[in-house]
């Protein structure tokens, strides 16, 4: 699946694998999220210069698991979608079990703060679910910071169950209470 067109709220979004030319826009999205968090208008729990960074996106691009959402040629959101479960997932109280081949994971979903309240987060998660189905995966997993109440509310609304909260250092960020989430397709 290289490209998927979805019409959401009369807006045309294109979900696709990211390209090298998308990296500056994705890094800018990360920077804008960090800026909004510094202002106190958003809480995701990420740290500038630590996670996520331009290197986060570049590494995912090299692995070919970085995805972008664009509208009229502008990248509005990105995410990493793969079958890599991070170490702390071992501590999850998972309801849905599956072999590594049956589990798809969503990481680092980032929506440009200037494009919020347009359904992009929901649309990206729906794209992730469709992508998982096409890849033969029936178990979905993801995580978020306990304090990221906006994401937690969205994921609950989309049918995801919380499978535990694990205190850890996550991607170089100390003292994170990581919420593990899951859904069965």
Where are the predicted features?
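Conserved GNAT acetyl-CoA-binding A-motif
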Residues: 125, 132-143
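Conserved beta-hairpin
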Residues: 65-79
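Conserved GNAT-fold acetyl-CoA-binding loop/helix
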Residues: 27, 34-56
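Conserved acyl-donor/pantetheine-binding loop and adjacent beta-alpha core of acyl/acetyltransferases
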Residues: 80-108, 115-116, 169-173
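A short helix-loop-beta-strand connector motif used in the catalytic cores of GNAT acetyltransferases and
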Residues: 54-68, 84-88, 105
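Conserved N-terminal entry element of GNAT/NAT acetyltransferase domains
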Residues: 1-24
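C-terminal "cap" of GNAT-fold acetyltransferases
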Residues: 98-100, 145-149, 156-158, 168-185
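Conserved acetyl-CoA-binding loop-helix of GNAT-fold acetyltransferases
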Residues: 111, 117-130, 153, 157
